[in-house]
Amino acid sequence: MDMSITSRDYVSATNPDCKAKQYTITIDGGYEASVITYGAVITDLIVPDKDGKPTDIMLGCKGLDEYMGNGANHGAVIGRSANRIKDASFVIDGVKYQIPKNEGENNLHSRNPGYQNVFWDAEILSEEEADEIILDSKIAGIPGCDGGAVLLSYTSPDGATGFPGNLDTKVLYCWLEDKTFLILYCGKTDKDTIFAPTNHAYFNLRGENAEGTVNNDLIMINSDKITIKDDMNVPTGELKDVEGTVFDCREYRFIGELNDSDDHQMVISKGIDQNFCLNTTAGTFSFAAAVTSPESGITMECLTDLPGIQIYAGNNLGSPLDIKTTKAYGQYDAICLEAQLVPNAVNLTGFDSPVIKAGKKVYHACGYRFV
């Protein structure tokens, strides 16, 4: 099959006037990705297993209504600020900003209206148009687009969820020439603000409806240090060497070893939910992590220019909305590889700042490559 991009209405089952668009990007070899304009959600990611069988490795929801009630943020772009902010407050240019306290005294994933719960505009781009955006990012090492792309756009208004500035945001989705599915973020603001997005994709390389957990899959992380978190899962600014610990994933280890560990950092979050400081190079699309399934034979690498990656194993999956086709999802049924800035970095020193300056265009990239 040649490369193609198709679209269809993605309609609420309860309100026919409520609808998004779904775009499906297909390339040779049996690789297919679908995204919707609500939440910039990746609904499907289909790749061949070791026998060539098409396998949807993306957990998700049944339809638009479920995605709109999607507390787990399946496949969604998160922002303006992904992950946690201590005391739900921060200071920019001498001004203190208070955002909603939605996880105890802290803020998690910005919330409504955040990127994950609004409707985005969309357009289909040619390969040449997508490559122009990739070049404009000035992130080295991103291969060329394979055939075409979908570009989603949303302006987060000044004061949304307490954040300053009108923040014009774009997300480019496309397959690259080396079988990488690329997520390229771009933000530009009229007032200094936070721009720290991620995508909350949940992966199961045996298939989204496969029985059992991901504990028997293997993970590798290009990281020598983790950020220590407090008992509310917020990084304190302290770093810990992974050497000699369960966090040492510089060579493949079973995901279950992490989830079953009695390390206090794991106990806090009922399994792995940790930011790893990556050995990546700023401004370069670099290897961050990989997951492989011996059962399906699928190996997926994560590449990014970002300095951190949150590894999360679906420790809290299990709501009635956590079902896409035939299986109700539960704890440890997925692995998330969330390339991002260090959580709570706006309140810490020694980490890349999530604050972008007025008038400056900022790009970040994350890609999932199948090898």
Regions found by a protein language model. Name each.
Residues D2-V371:
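An exposed, glycine/acidic-rich loop-and-rim segment of catalytic or binding clefts
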